[in-house]
From Swiss-Prot:
Signal peptide: 1-26
Superkingdom assignment: Eukaryota
Coiled coil regions, renumbered to chain: none
Gene Ontology, cellular component aspect: endosome membrane; fungal-type vacuole membrane; Golgi apparatus; Golgi membrane; membrane
Annotated glycosylation sites: N157
Cytoplasmic side: 288-337, 386-401, 458-488, 545-558, 620-629
Name listed for the protein in its UniProt record: Transmembrane 9 superfamily protein C1105.08
Family: Belongs to the nonaspanin (TM9SF) (TC 9.A.2) family.
Keywords in alphabetical order: Glycoprotein, Golgi apparatus, Membrane, Signal, Transmembrane, Transmembrane helix, Vacuole
PANTHER family per record: TRANSMEMBRANE 9 SUPERFAMILY MEMBER 2 (PTHR10766:SF111), TRANSMEMBRANE 9 SUPERFAMILY PROTEIN (PTHR10766)
Length: 629
């Protein structure tokens, strides 16, 4: 009997989840229903952040800045209004405000001056520095990112890159783009409704001109250079033109989702699948040939006992194979966290496959991540308690209390530190204090109670009965090959799951640090499935050879070996820094390597837990198949 109050606990769990989802998604998500505009109607235009971009394959910084940061001196509307954002948008650094640019459906505008501003020399130097680091400006028109055409594409088959350059480095100096040629594509439905299906900007640099102190559109072909050590008077202007498009509203995001490396990705996924298939084949050989033959021989009444002692090492440790590992408290907490991350990752991939998480829903990825992590506190508590009980741990109350606080507490402390670094650089990525309070409130109100409920159910669940008895006196472990030691096994075994996600890791890091849209969830779905399978296969093979060498300390080994994939992720991040990021900023380095370390640790927990679960089922299965006198 599991728990007398299971029905009431289940009802409470459902209520908790319902309230949590309502709380998380009560933040405005980007709407997915089309908006129709009659001729002359005002188009929704907003400004976002100034963000880094990978120029010539390299990035130079990772800090975002608000569009209306005083150092930019951009033109402002009469009343600046902050736009509603999802929780995920706030966490990912989006800061949306209304725009001073007025656009009306099907009305062309030829060079409209916005304003004139005086930029002091210190701010000119700041802007020059960002231009040299390939920063881009981010606008939105009808909730669609304003973009520029990617180089090397043609008019029939083109893709767009969200954002447009702040300026450009030339041989004569640094120029600032202060005129924006805005081209908006529209589509007319069968009911004569007009919809925005594309928006891009061709930024131009024009020498600023004032007439009687008022800004006017310059007819000069000279660019606007940014002087060194001097103030600058800047005039900003824009033009608007409309272009009909056959693209329906439902597919307007396809232009942003051009994948030039699609063929390479499929080839890599096929290679990863081949590796995975080979591992499955090896495990199948072990299970259906070697083990089956060994078990039949071992169970035979006519086999000589000395032959058994000689030939079948994995069966000799049957009296110790379920002996509890060292540090069961720590081990169980890490397994609970890994199960929580597995639940969260699986949910995100499934949400993306079904379109709940998509680039068109701004902030949906981060919002879903937060919601799933909070809900999966139940999974963490249950798996941690069940594992601790399996390992014959005695401090159950301590396990119940530590599970929801150890790893999440480490993550919170790291995130607060990173937030202080963002704040010191006046970056828009600084998470507001109110958002921190909300996250902590959600965690304490939902995750901690859910974790406690999961732990109670786990501790009161049916006792696990090992298929073989554990001897009172531990068996002496003989010496074995160095290749069967923990470290060499982890180095070899952890490299295989890492190779499965290597190509996808490039795209994830590019999206994380330089903000291109990440939409390749189809590839992620295959990679994630192959990763999970590979971790299980690697762990099973490692444990099998370890048991064959009569070493029964397999518990931690089954966790560390596939978990070593996280170490490779960090090593890869170091190479990514040297080959893709050219920055001498200490703050940038601290943030980059801090986030990389945090992500690598979480990958370690995820892969390690998956490997242990597979190995435990494997060990339980094979020892349940032999007869012990």
């Amino acid at each position: 009997m599991l728990l007398p109050s299971i029905p009431s606990c289940s009802f409470s769990f459902v209520v908790f989840v319902s309230v949590l989802l309502q709380t998380c998604f009560s933040f405005q998500l980007t709407p997915l229903s089309p908006k129709n505009y009659p001729p002359g109607a005002s188009i929704d235009t907003t400004v976002n952040t100034i963000s880094p971009f990978i120029g010539d394959g390299r990035g130079s910084d990772i800090f975002n800045y608000e569009y209306y940061d005083e150092r930019f001196h951009f033109c402002r509307p009469e009343n600046i209004a902050k736009q509603s954002e999802s929780l995920g948008s706030v966490l990912f650094g989006d800061r949306l405000y209304n725009s001073p640019i007025e656009i009306k459906m099907l009305e062309n505008q030829d060079c409209v001056p916005l304003c004139a501003s005086i930029i002091p020399s210190s701010d000119v130097s700041f802007i020059r520095d960002l231009i040299s680091k390939n920063y881009v400006v981010n606008w939105n028109i009808d909730n669609l990112p304003v973009a520029t055409y990617l180089e090397g594409t043609n008019s029939k088959n083109y893709s767009l890159s969200p954002g447009f350059p702040l300026g450009k480095n030339t041989e004569k100096g640094v120029i600032l783009f202060n005129h924006y040629d805005i081209v908006i594509e529209y589509h007319t439905t069968s009911s004569d409704q007009h919809r925005v299906v594309g928006a891009y900007v061709k930024p131009v640099s024009k020498e600023s001109t004032l007439v009687d102190g008022n800004p006017v559109c310059s007819s000069s072909s000279n660019p606007q250079y940014l002087p060194e050590g001097a103030d600058l008077t800047l005039v900003t202007s824009y033009s608007v033109s409309w272009k009909y498009s056959d693209t329906p509203w439902a597919t307007r995001w396809d232009k942003y989702m051009h994948i030039e490396s699609r063929q390479i990705r499929w080839i890599f996924i096929i290679h990863s699948a081949i590796i995975d298939t080979f591992l499955i084949f090896v495990v199948s050989i072990i299970l259906y040939r070697t083990l089956n033959r060994d078990i039949n021989k071992y169970n035979s009444a006519f086999v000589d006992q000395e032959d058994v002692q000689e030939d079948f090492g994995w069966k000799l440790v049957h009296g110790d194979v379920f002996r509890p590992p060292r540090r069961p408290m720590l081990f169980s907490i890490l397994l609970g966290t890994g199960a929580q991350l597995l639940f969260m990752s699986s949910g995100i991939v499934l949400f993306a496959i079904f379109g709940i998480v998509a680039p068109s829903r701004r902030g949906s990825l981060a919002t879903a991540t937060v919601a799933l992590f909070i809900i999966s506190g139940f999974v963490s508590g249950y798996v941690s308690a069940l594992s601790y009980k399996l390992m014959q741990g005695m401090l159950r109350k301590r396990n119940l209390l530590l599970t929801p606080f150890v790893v999440p507490g480490f993550m919170l402390a790291a995130a607060l530190f990173f937030n202080m670094v963002f704040w010191s650089k006046s970056s828009s990525s600084t998470v507001p204090f109110s958002s921190w309070l909300l996250l902590i409130f959600l965690y304490l109100l939902f995750t901690v109670p859910l974790s406690f409920v999961g732990s109670l159910i786990g501790f009161r669940s049916r006792e696990f009965v090992p298929p073989v008895r554990t001897n009172q006196i531990p068996r002496q472990i003989p010496s074995h090959s160095i290749w069967l030691s923990s470290f060499p096994s982890a180095i070899i075994g952890g490299s295989i799951p890492f190779l499965v996600i290597l190509i996808e890791l490039f795209s994830i890091l590019d999206s994380l640090w330089f903000h291109p849209l990440y939409f390749m969830f189809g590839f992620s779905f295959f990679c994630f499935g192959i990763l999970v399978t590979t971790c299980i296969m690697v762990s099973i093979i490692t444990v099998y050879f370890q048991l064959c060498s009569e070493n029964y300390n397999w518990w931690w080994r089954s966790f560390i070996t596939p978990g070593f994939c996280g170490i490779y992720v960090f090593i890869f991040s170091v190479f990514y820094w040297f080959f893709k990021i050219s920055s001498s900023s200490l703050a940038t380095a601290v943030l980059y390597f801090g986030y990389s370390l945090l992500i690598s640790v979480l990958v370690f927990f995820l892969c390690g837990s998956v490997g242990f679960f597979g190995a435990f089922l494997f060990v339980n299965k094979i020892y349940a198949s032999i007869k012990i006198d």
